[in-house]
Amino acid sequence: MNQDELKTLVGRAALEYVPEGSIVGVGTGSTVNCFIDALAGIKERIAGAVSSSVKSTERLREKGIRVFEAAAVESLPVYIDGADEIDPHGCMIKGGGAALTREKIVADLAERFVCIADASKLVDVLGRFPLPVEVLPMAVSQIQRRFAKLGATATVREGVITDNGQLILDVQGLRIGDPLAFETEVNQWPGVVTVGVFARHKASVCLLGTPEGVKTLRF
């Protein structure tokens, strides 16, 4: 199976984690698009979705799925999203689609986080994929200097403005051995909206697409 077929496979597998009558948290990205397409097939059995991005909201509405604002719900039974990297403990790098802040907001509402990804996203240590960081424009240079002190290079993602009107720095040259400590530190830097390490909101389950089928990892 190619990568697109693996994404379709895990997108469909994630339906098993959607309770009947529920509002489901929906992430952002190409793998999530496959989940949204699958979700459309059972839309009569759910109340709707809370979306983490404008793009996902548009796709959900195109499929006839009702979209609720995050502020309108107190909790969600499940949040389903992809990952750019996931480690053996369920910690992730996310934000390749520039929706990391809203993804964390929706993930925080959810009782469990189900990650859907192909097998290439499973790594021993986070950091090979460029780490996205959402930042205020006036703080870009300061934050770049902070990462330089860590031996990393932070580059502004050209032509990208987040749904929150901010910029994305992509950081290369990191090896994140303690994701929780790293997330906590970077989130305290003035001007950082959020860093794309998901350790406080790590996956409960990962549905990993492999040539042999879906492999379920529980954390």
Swiss-Prot record:
Keywords: Isomerase
Keyword Transmembrane helix: no
GO molecular function terms listed in the Swiss-Prot or TrEMBL record: ribose-5-phosphate isomerase activity
Catalytic activity: aldehydo-D-ribose 5-phosphate = D-ribulose 5-phosphate
Listed InterPro entries: NagB/RpiA_transferase-like, Ribose5P_isomerase_typA_subgr, Ribose5P_isomerase_type_A
Record-listed substrate binding positions: T28, G29, S30, T31, D81, G82, A83, D84, K94, G95, G96, G97, K121
Catalytic residues of the enzyme: E103 (proton acceptor)
Pathway named in the protein's UniProt entry: Carbohydrate degradation; pentose phosphate pathway; D-ribose 5-phosphate from D-ribulose 5-phosphate (non-oxidative stage): step 1/1
Gene Ontology CC, one term: cytosol
EC number(s) stated in the UniProt entry for this protein: 5.3.1.6
Family: Belongs to the ribose 5-phosphate isomerase family.
Subunit structure: Homodimer.
Role of this protein: Catalyzes the reversible conversion of ribose-5-phosphate to ribulose 5-phosphate.
This protein's name: Ribose-5-phosphate isomerase A
Gene that encodes the chain: rpiA
